[in-house]
From Swiss-Prot:
The gene is rplW. Belongs to the universal ribosomal protein uL23 family. Transmembrane segments: none annotated. It comes from Corynebacterium diphtheriae (strain ATCC 700971 / NCTC 13129 / Biotype gravis). One of its GO terms (biological process) is translation. One of the early assembly proteins it binds 23S rRNA. One of the proteins that surrounds the polypeptide exit tunnel on the outside of the ribosome. Forms the main docking site for trigger factor binding to the ribosome. GO terms for molecular function: rRNA binding; structural constituent of ribosome. Part of the 50S ribosomal subunit. Contacts protein L29, and trigger factor when it is bound to the ribosome. This is Large ribosomal subunit protein uL23.
Length: 101
């Protein structure tokens, strides 16, 4: 396997949303990831950080929203999300410290 950057530079944070809680029941977890990370790097980073086996990785790039303020317009930063599905029989990831939904 190729050596990658520090896994904590690739996986930034878990996504906290209703969708991510619902996906946890299907053994799929959502994370904010570095915009330059590819699926292979994300898979290796998840396996190193959490000690689980990854079945598949899907990614989604989200453009930043245009927001208006009193002085004009600004743009929220764009994000990249990774939806990681674990292999059957793999242990669950406890990223929120409690029971799912």
């Amino acid at each position: 396997m190729a050596k990658i950057a520090d896994p904590r530079d690739i996986i930034l944070a878990p996504v906290v949303s209703e969708k991510s809680y619902g996906l946890m029941e299907q053994n799929t977890y959502a994370f904010f990831v570095a915009p330059t990370a590819n699926k292979t790097e994300i898979k290796i980073a998840i396996e190193q950080i959490f000690g689980v086996k990854v079945d598949s990785v899907n990614t989604a790039n989200r453009a930043g929203k245009r927001k208006r303020s009193r002085t004009g317009y600004g743009v929220r930063k764009a994000t990249k999300r990774a939806y990681v599905t674990l292999r059957e029989g793999s242990d669950a990831i406890d990223i929120f410290g409690g029971n799912a939904a």
